[in-house]
């Protein structure tokens, strides 16, 4: 049995959850998110909790059960607290400017690299750090991954864009002649 799917989701004050035929709407102080209903699952709102159940005990149903519960939980957290990921830029001559929806970076290429975030995601810059924030966990993670992919950290000196809490595996340089 799915251990995650069996746990009820507590609804905080100020959050309303509406269960529809094909989607679940979660509205809160930071905004509104729509979660699609997964097959073979049913969602009920009872008192101050959301309970997700499944129709049978097939392996696929168990997987959908846990996924549905996790998606609803992420939506509830998103509309109350929000999500954020922090990235840092390391490298000589690497610069960062802008904020809001668009940032411009000098990453050692012959041209400045511009990145425009999708709607619902905010970018803030602080010296050599980028903070990606928003209410949709999937969008925030996707934007952070796209920014990181512009200049992945290299293993010798660690130059590039990396997550703040990421641990890089470094390599030793060439030994050379003696």
PLM region descriptions:
Residues 2-145, 149-178:
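N-terminal intrinsically disordered, cationic/polar leader segments
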């Amino acid at each position: 049995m799915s251990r995650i799917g069996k746990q009820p989701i507590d609804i905080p004050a100020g959050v309303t959850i509406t269960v529809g035929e094909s989607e679940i709407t979660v509205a809160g102080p930071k905004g509104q998110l729509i979660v699609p209903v997964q097959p073979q699952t049913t969602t009920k709102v009872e008192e101050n909790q959301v309970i997700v159940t499944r129709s049978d005990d097939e392996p696929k149903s168990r997987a959908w059960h846990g996924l549905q519960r996790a998606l609803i939980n992420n939506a509830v957290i998103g509309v109350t607290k929000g999500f954020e990921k922090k990235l840092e830029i390391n490298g000589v001559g690497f610069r960062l400017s802008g904020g809001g929806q668009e940032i411009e970076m000098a990453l050692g290429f012959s041209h400045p690299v511009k990145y425009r975030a999708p709607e619902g995601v905010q970018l803030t810059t602080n010296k050599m750090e980028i903070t990606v924030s928003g209410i949709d966990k999937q969008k925030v993670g996707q934007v952070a991954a796209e920014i990181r992919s512009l200049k992945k950290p290299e293993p010798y000196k660690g130059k590039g864009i990396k997550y703040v809490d990421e641990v890089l595996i470094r390599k030793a340089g060439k030994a050379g002649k003696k």
